[in-house]
Curated annotation (Swiss-Prot):
Coiled-coil region(s): none
GO molecular function (one): structural constituent of ribosome
One GO cellular component, as annotated: ribosome
Species of the source: Azobacteroides pseudotrichonymphae genomovar. CFP2
Gene that encodes it: rpmH
Protein name: Large ribosomal subunit protein bL34
Family of this protein: Belongs to the bacterial ribosomal protein bL34 family.
Transmembrane feature ranges: none
Length: 50
């Protein structure tokens, strides 16, 4: 059997990136809570261009 985690940067950014978080109300809630907590990295997108 293969390992269950098959990493792909495209899938990662499409599912957990900033633009995909902004699309839904729940995603915006995630961003708001991470901002309130003071996270330096809001989404996985911040690893690449910030």
């Amino acid at each position: 059997m293969k390992q269950t985690f098959q990493p792909s940067n495209r899938k990662r950014k499409n599912k957990h990136g900033f633009r995909s978080r902004m699309k839904t109300i729940n995603g915006r809630r995630i961003l708001a809570s991470r901002r309130a907590k003071g996270r330096k990295k809001l989404t996985v997108s911040d690893e690449y261009n910030g």
